[in-house]
A protein has these predicted regions:
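A structural signal for multi-pass alpha-helical bundles of membrane permease subunits
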Residues: 1-222
């Protein structure tokens, strides 16, 4: 019964919404974080160290501190009520954790490879896509797992910005089973809660080998 959803909106719709948000946001995180990490690790420019320190400091800020300013900003942009606040910011490397992780991995790659590529006439873009990117695959897969799971389980952001039931992700749709004004359907709620963790579990078990490899290699190189 839980799969039937609410108000003619099936639970499959909520699953599709969560998959869309999680996959697109994860892609944005990987693309932006890897590019920024490469720039901080390999490119020399004024203020690089200050930018790196600022990124580390941003990791220490609780997300709740930024919620009100972010909401007001997204409201001015007209993004409230859409998926834009849940997706677009991740294309700008807003999560320092992934930048730091990938940057540490890139630091472990011998710079002699870059120098040899420059002698052959490669630009920074060629070095990144042809040399660095294939070598940081374990770090990218590790980041994929963490990013997907965090986006899939994100409840508070969806609660702030999504105001239509048809756009609810799974994390937000589950609360619809809990009705404080009447009896809650606990059977359906537990069944859907169990199904809701399946995508993250499947991804974790399929990529577990790469996750362990990425963490162990990052630890050795860091």
């Amino acid at each position: 019964n839980g799969w039937k959803g609410f108000a003619k909106i099936t639970f499959a719709t909520f699953f599709k919404n969560s998959l869309f948000i999680s996959i697109v946001a994860t892609m944005g995180t990987l693309i932006s974080s890897s590019l920024v990490a490469f720039g901080l690790s390999r490119c020399k420019f004024f203020g690089r160290r200050a930018l790196f320190v600022a990124m580390l400091l941003s990791m220490m800020l609780p997300a709740q501190v930024l919620m009100i300013p972010q909401y007001l900003w997204y409201q001015k942009l007209g993004w409230v009520g859409s998926y834009k606040p849940l997706i677009i910011p991740y294309f700008f490397a807003i999560q320092g954790f992934f930048v730091y992780q990938i940057s540490n991995f890139i630091d472990g790659i011998p710079r002699e490879l870059d120098e040899a590529a420059k002698i052959d006439g490669c630009s920074y873009y060629s070095i990144f896509f042809r040399i660095v990117l294939p070598l940081i695959t374990p770090a990218l897969i590790t980041s994929t797992i963490f990013s997907f799971m965090w986006r899939w389980d994100d409840f508070l952001s969806a609660l702030l910005y999504i105001n239509e039931s048809a756009k609810y992700p799974v994390s937000l749709a589950l609360k619809l089973f809990c009705d404080p004004g009447s009896s809650s359907d606990y059977g359906a709620m537990f069944a859907m809660a169990t199904l809701s963790i399946m995508p993250a579990m499947i991804m974790f078990f399929c990529l577990q080998k790469y996750l362990v490899e990425g963490i162990s290699t990052s630890g050795l190189k860091g």
